[in-house]
């Protein structure tokens, strides 16, 4: 009998997907990694601890990778692997913030390439590595979930527990008898019970809610690193991009056209020529304007620049540098806009347009050199600082970006290609910043005798590894104008005697802190600094004893 209910199609029964298979090594290394994370990082800083944990993660992941996996043939995999190990070593050696950032970012990017070996974009690899944390945590939850046949297991344990009850009671009776009859056996067992009690007391003292949550954090992060569960979305999105701009007609019904578009277009045949004329006129005008600006900068800044006593060099560098960098970025954006699609194939005038755009790019490179010279003069006037080093890093990226714009102009490179190349360059700059002991170099540069005005508060606020350099140059503070910045952002004068007292206090605090540190929080640079002050203290004691002996 046909009824309405029978005519409705039944909803197919959905079967839950089986959990992602894990190897025995991964299951064993998960608790090991969580315990290692807790030992290395609980109430410790990221120093030698970060190097050891990174080596553990890299070794564990590589140990579970098949010999014929596609990831071994990926150049991005090897690049980020070397970057991860290099930055991790620099964390243990120098311990700078740039090294820590580079190590964590490199490890996540490397795990992203492990997940999807065919990825090329560094940003997509970073997002893939971060997203892998979510399915990994879900898979870890499946491991910790109680089995379905828990009831039968409990019954089985209860059965065997009752069988062992009588032997355990008998063992306890004989233990009491032997302890009464044999004093040495009694002393040995008392010592064992005391050790067990001390171990349990230490365990319960350290067990706290924050510590437990920190251990769970280590368990989650270790699972996110060790459980590489494939995530294909970003790799599928990247596969749609190409390295070059190809001429493709969308108004064609063909398998070669992924998304044919037959909508009415308002674009008329002469509109492309109008766009070409607009681009040509714009490039001609801005080239002329930029030529005037570059001519002024070359004549004023490049050769024989000597600022007047009343010249505001701070405004000249800070505001001028930011405005010039913004103009370079806008120039790159305009070139990318005009060469995004059809003008690449406009045969009547594409060569003229390319020549004009090339001249503009080269003039922007000249402008970048002018920005670098502004920054150089400011460094020669007031010393090194973090932002002044960062300006040079940004200018390196800018020059590389201008070179990739030339590739787009002459080789019809796509925007995807430019993003890929510039992301690799940004990653290289990050590794470059991670590999430098910049604070020590800044102290050595800023305390040169030619600088009469020194921001000594800025130098005292640097990490502890610069203290030996400050101590070696403390005798050069006399006769200088020392300043420091107060909590309200105002500059206050600092007497040389007060500066030496502040330095002595910093050294005393550093030695006390270094003595309290455990081995996971140590770096080679801080160890060298502590050794320097220890040797200096021993030399002082020897000199005092020698003077005391010479009096008698």
Model-derived features with residue positions:
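Short aromatic-rich membrane-water interface segments that cap or initiate transmembrane helices
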Residues: 159, 197-213, 310-327, 384-395, ...
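Transmembrane-helix bundle segments that line or gate the permeation/cavity pathway
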Residues: 40-191, 210-239
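N-terminal signal-anchor module of multipass membrane proteins
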Residues: 1-67
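Hydrophobic alpha-helical transmembrane segments in integral membrane proteins
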Residues: 430-456
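Membrane-helix interface motif
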Residues: 176-194, 291-308, 369-377, 442
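Extracytosolic and intramembrane catalytic regions of membrane-associated proteins
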Residues: 460-552
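Juxtamembrane membrane-water interface segments of multi-pass membrane proteins
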Residues: 6-24, 65-74, 121, 142-160, ...
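Membrane-embedded alpha-helical segments of integral membrane proteins
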Residues: 359-409
């Amino acid at each position: 009998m046909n009824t309405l209910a029978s005519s409705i199609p039944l909803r197919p029964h959905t079967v839950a997907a089986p959990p992602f298979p894990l190897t025995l090594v991964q299951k064993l290394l998960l608790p090991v990694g969580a315990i290692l994370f807790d030992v290395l990082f609980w109430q410790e800083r990221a120093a030698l601890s970060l190097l050891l944990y990174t080596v553990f993660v890299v070794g564990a992941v590589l140990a579970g990778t098949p010999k014929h996996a596609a990831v071994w043939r990926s150049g991005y995999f090897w690049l980020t692997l070397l970057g991860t190990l290099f930055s991790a070593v620099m964390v243990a050696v120098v311990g700078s913030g740039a090294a820590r950032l580079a190590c964590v970012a490199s490890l996540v990017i490397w795990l992203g390439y492990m997940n999807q070996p065919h990825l090329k974009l560094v940003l997509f690899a970073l997002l893939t590595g971060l997203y892998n944390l979510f399915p990994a945590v879900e898979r870890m939850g499946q491991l910790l979930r109680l089995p379905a046949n828990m009831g039968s297991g409990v019954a089985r344990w209860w059965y065997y527990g009752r069988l062992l009850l009588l032997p355990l009671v008998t063992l306890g009776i004989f233990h009491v008898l032997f302890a009464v009859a044999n004093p040495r056996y009694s002393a040995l067992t008392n010592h064992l019970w005391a050790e067990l009690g001390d171990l349990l007391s230490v365990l319960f003292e350290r067990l706290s809610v924050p510590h437990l949550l920190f251990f769970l954090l280590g368990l989650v992060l270790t699972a996110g690193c060790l459980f590489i569960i494939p995530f294909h979305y970003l790799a599928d999105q990247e596969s749609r991009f190409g390295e070059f701009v190809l001429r493709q007609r969308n108004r064609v019904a063909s398998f070669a056209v992924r998304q044919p578009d037959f909508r009415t277009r308002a674009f008329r045949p002469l509109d492309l020529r109008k766009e070409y004329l607009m681009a040509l006129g714009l490039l001609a005008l801005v080239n002329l304007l930029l030529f005037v600006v570059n001519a002024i900068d070359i004549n004023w800044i490049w050769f024989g620049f000597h600022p007047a006593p009343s010249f505001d060099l701070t405004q000249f560098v800070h505001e001028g540098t930011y405005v010039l960098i913004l103009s370079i970025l806008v120039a790159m954006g305009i070139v990318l806009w005009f060469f995004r699609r059809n003008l690449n194939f406009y045969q009547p005038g594409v060569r003229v347009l390319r020549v004009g755009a090339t001249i503009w790019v080269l003039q922007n490179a000249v402008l970048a050199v002018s920005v670098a010279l502004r920054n150089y003069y400011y460094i020669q006037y007031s010393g090194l600082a973090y932002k002044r080093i960062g300006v040079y890093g940004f200018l390196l990226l800018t020059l590389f970006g201008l070179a990739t714009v030339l590739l787009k102009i002459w080789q019809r490179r796509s925007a995807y290609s430019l993003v890929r190349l510039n992301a690799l360059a940004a990653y290289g700059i990050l590794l470059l910043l991670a590999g430098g002991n910049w604070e020590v170099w800044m102290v050595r540069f800023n305390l040169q005798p030619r600088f009469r005005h020194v921001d000594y508060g800025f130098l005292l606020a640097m990490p502890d590894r610069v203290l030996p350099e400050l101590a070696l140059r403390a005798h050069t503070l006399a006769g200088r104008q020392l300043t420091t910045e107060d909590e309200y952002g105002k500059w206050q004068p600092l007497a040389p005697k007060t500066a030496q007292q502040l330095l002595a206090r910093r050294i005393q605090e550093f030695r006390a802190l270094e003595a309290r540190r455990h081995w996971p929080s140590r770096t080679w640079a801080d160890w060298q600094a502590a050794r320097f002050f220890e040797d200096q203290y021993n030399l002082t004691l020897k000199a005092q004893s020698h003077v005391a002996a010479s009096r008698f």
